[in-house]
Amino acid sequence: MRLIMMKVSAYDLNKIAEKLNLSIKDLNKAFSRKILREDEYKEIKTLLFKKEFKGIEKGTVIFLNDNLDVVRGYPKTYRAITLYPTIKKHFIDKVVIEEKLNGYNIRIVKIDGEVYALTRSGYICPFTTKKVKKFLNLEILDDYSEYMLCGEMIGINNPYTPYYYKEVDRGFENLGFYIFDIKERETNKSLPIKERINLCEKYNLPYVKPLAVVDKDEAHIHVREIIEKLNKEGREGVVLKDPDMAVSPIKYTTHYTQCEDLKSAFTFFFDLGMDFLFSRVVREGFMSYEFKETLEERKNRAKDLGEAILLPMVETINKVASGERVSEDFELIFDSEEDFDEFLDFMRKMKMVITIKNIEKIDTEEGVKIKAVIGKIYNKTNDKIISYLNGTLWE
């Protein structure tokens, strides 16, 4: 069989296959299907799994260095649609309840003496890499280079999932990182929760603190109470974990989050609407059933859902009708114009259609910063609205 060597011909594909516990045949199949692709960051060459393949997680990265260092992709966290009996069936004994933060998933690693922050998809994000170096004491990766720090970057000033958190407000910037998992980066094995917490406290690293530790037989009662409290506070939800991480975590989100997701999706409804709609409405239906809502409570839930869908949709149509090209806007803070330009290059590399809406220098207690508003354009939504407003028929 002819091997697909590409630009990685300088590297031993047999060793790469061995590292991943794959056959050469499977490795070439991943190349030919464009599941395994090349990437580069500041002349650091990597291979990246764009999809799950033969047990290798999406977002898994192989650094093409002498060691062929592997960073496994973060596994998908499955969702509980019902609290009971799902939690009782899934867990062994005790259940650790942690808050689910509304941000973007990042893995922090140290390879050949350099720190990198990888997105869920496996790209080295220059914006996030610079921020975690600034925010965190990363000496832990000097002592435990085999680990990856898995966590959530949260705050309104982030380029992927902007949402305000008062606990990460720094005056001129609302951004921060919380660790929710520490894994062996080549095996994806998680540390037990107590061990992870001890390490975070030893190195003074911010981490997601457990809200409760409960017996699995009664966990559904406690989770519901916590979910109702988080819903009132406008928070996202919970992640449920085994204390030893012996079984995979599961998640459960609030009514508030479902509605906020729909609002975001139906602002750009021709691009995102269908992908978001069905799953969230199903979650709401099962939540209404399990929480034994009265007819009045159910009608209120339905009203919330309807408003989350219709109001942003009509607002978008109005904006486009008045000549505006709608975009999802992010306000970001950079240390320099060079950092700003580097991030723009990264976004274009990700095939994002962007527009710079504003850029200015601001004085902070840390010196002069660059504040930029970047708009992500959803062409399909803009173009289809214009088309239908001009009389095109729905096919």
From Swiss-Prot:
Source organism superkingdom: Archaea
Any one Pfam family match given in the protein's UniProt record, by short name: RNA_ligase
Protein name as annotated: Uncharacterized protein MJ0414
Organism the protein comes from: Methanocaldococcus jannaschii (strain ATCC 43067 / DSM 2661 / JAL-1 / JCM 10045 / NBRC 100440)
